[in-house]
Amino acid sequence: MKSGNPVLRDSTFSNAQPGAAVMTLDGVVNKTGVLLLLCMASFCYAWYQPTVSMPLMMAGAIGGFVVALITCFVPRISPYTGPAYAILEGLLLGGLSAMMEAAYPYIAVQAAALTFGTLAIMLTLYKTRVIRVTEGLKTGIIAATAAIALLYFVGFILNMFGKGIPYIHSTGWIGIGFSLFVVGLAAFNLLLDFDFIENGILNGAPKHMEWYAGFSLLVTLVWLYLELLRLLSKLRGRD
């Protein structure tokens, strides 16, 4: 099993012990719901703290990245690190959304609606097998995701020297096309997440993996929301 989401790996589900409680679909849904509620709660807190938006965003971004790395390497502690990640990412998203809302009214609501709408559509496509998660599809999505991650990393380094990658962040058609591609890629990563989770359940993954699965889905949803914010801001910036 492979996934474009870096927190979902083949080795992740290989630690179930005979006779131990195992991962279930209901458990994954419940744990994911808890993480989403925690994320939304901290989102709302950051939203209503405009005077400290930047510190909250920095704490959420750095803290969330560190916690995500720890969770990837030590999945068994995901019942603790998963909620921590959700809270930290809520601070990041809430602060960023509030800042963008000041420039583009209702952009946060639009991005949230599109995020959950995309989740519902991709889940339907997966469940009905309209799109089948083949090895070829997995390989293509993984390669494209790695390429985007590398591109963003290079852009980050260039920004430190006062430069940047031209066009992709502009409000022109190249920039909008790039954002559409990345949004689509994030959406297709949801398919890989669903596939990996389904296989984890079939293989009898340990119970704590319900939290890890919820954490993994949240990682993809956060990425999708951020990319939708970026896309909507480009479209609104053309007005």
Regions found by a protein language model. Give the residues of each.
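A hydrophobic alpha-helical transmembrane-helix feature that marks the membrane cores
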Residues: 1-239
